[in-house]
């Protein structure tokens, strides 16, 4: 998958020093996400972090994280084109990593899975405390509703009691 990420314009961040720079620019001092990264392009974030040689057309900075959940701030939500990559050996291990990240930040929100294996889809859905499971669709956009999935179109997604919200669905005029 990393090879495909590269083909699609990802810059893979593996160097420990570059990862530390990325952590610091996104989460200064290990705290809240930096508002200065919001909405920036991948090359702009890289420049802010002092990461050299990132091509101008780079679409995402993909950092190989050092752990799951609280073990690495790059597992947290980032409102910019930065993502974490965490290798795993089995499907179950991958789902366990996802659950650990959701427990740390994101409980009740959503997951996305791309699979033709119904057993894998069901397994992932059952393991996660989420309000919506997006299957074989771009979850970043269709979790908020789409004519192809039956979710109510919205820009406000409830996380239910897992996320300390009063509702678990997609907010609409009916709520």
Q: What are the roles of these predicted feature ranges?
A:
Residues 1, 52-175:
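Conserved C-terminal structural/oligomerization subdomain of aldehyde/semialdehyde dehydrogenase
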Residues 1-69, 94:
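ALDH superfamily catalytic-core signature
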């Amino acid at each position: 998958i990393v090879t495909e990420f590269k083909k699609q314009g990802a810059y893979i961040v593996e160097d420990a020093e570059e990862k530390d720079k990325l952590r610091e620019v996104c989460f200064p001092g290990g705290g809240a996400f930096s508002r200065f990264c919001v909405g920036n392009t991948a090359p702009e974030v890289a420049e802010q972090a002092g990461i050299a040689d990132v091509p101008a057309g780079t679409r995402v900075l993909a950092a190989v994280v050092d752990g799951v959940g609280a073990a690495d701030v790059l597992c947290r939500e980032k409102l910019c084109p930065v993502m974490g990559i965490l290798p795993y050996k089995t499907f179950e291990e991958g789902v366990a990593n996802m659950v650990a990240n959701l427990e740390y930040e994101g409980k009740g929100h959503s997951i996305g899975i791309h699979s033709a294996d119904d057993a894998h889809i069901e397994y992932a859905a059952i393991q996660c405390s989420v309000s919506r499971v997006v299957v074989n669709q771009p979850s970043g956009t269709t979790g908020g509703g789409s004519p192809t999935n039956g979710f109510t179109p919205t820009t406000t997604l409830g996380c239910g009691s897992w996320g300390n919200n009063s509702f678990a669905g997609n907010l609409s005029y009916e709520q």
